[in-house]
Amino acid sequence: MLTDKQKEKLNEFRDVFIEYPIISTVFNDFDRLRLGKGLAGEKPCMLLNGDTGTGKTALIKQYKERYLPQFINGVMNHPVLVSRIPSNPTLESTLAELLKDLGQLGSTERKLRINGTRLTTSLIKCLKTCGTELIIIDEFQELIEHNQGKKRREIANRLKYINDEAGVSIVLVGMPWAEKIADEPQWSSRLLVRRQLPYFKLSENPKHFVQLIIGLANRMPFTEKPNLSEQATVFALFSLSKGCFRTLKYFLDDAVLYALMDNAKTLTTKHLV
């Protein structure tokens, strides 16, 4: 059994976020889009995709925490709005989800009885009032998977309209097939920034994977930091995870748990078996 202190240390490690090169690049993209809010001209949008386990949700959460809502002159300022495409989305449910995540008062059920035009007007007004500088919409593949033709174009057109009228850049985040949104004429030229979160590949950038392992090792809750950067260990961890960040992190979370239960001073190879 773990002591309360050990549980606290384990939870801290489970919540660790490592910013490796592609993450830094995406954060810089977000910053440029957000800071463009006060400039003239069209507001460019961005498409960010990656397979399951590449860290999309953790990345979004980390960026949002850098710009949390706060009261300014009696108004709740909401610089970064993070939302998602609901399952089997309609125009109304998509807009209602954005309003809900912006902190708009009233139940989603009540809003769904309001037509899309009124929802759009309300959302644009709230975005301006709240000083929103960037909208990040996760799970965008839901729009691709469940909507074809007219309904998908309707939602895509409305998001484009919000981008124009509110003057806020929008980041669309999803699985690789979310790229199909670029087939829509109204979005093909609007997505000026496109990034992909890939799995790690030792054949291309081995140092990035090694740096990630070192970063995780340095944040492990032990008096002696483990050495996980030896070639044999790196290859073993890569073979186990297949370059997937989530798989690697889950494995190391368990290894840290076993080491804490063992009251070990550091993580050793026996905890990695």
Describe the predicted segments one by one.
Residues 1-4, 27, 31, 90-97, ...:
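Mid-core helix/loop region of P-loop NTP-binding domains shared across ATPases and GTPases
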Residues 65-76, 104-107:
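Post-Walker A helix-loop "phosphate-sensing" segment adjacent to the P-loop in P-loop NTPases
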Residues 2-11, 53, 202-205, 210-273:
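C-terminal alpha-helical "lid" subdomain
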Residues 41-61:
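Walker A/P-loop nucleotide-binding motif
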Residues 78-89:
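A short hydrophobic beta-strand->loop->alpha-helix junction that borders the nucleotide-binding pocket
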Residues 61-65, 249:
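The feature captures the helix immediately C-terminal to the Walker
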Residues 144, 156-228, 232:
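The catalytic "switch" region of P-loop NTPases
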Residues 1-43, 273:
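A short, basic N-terminal segment
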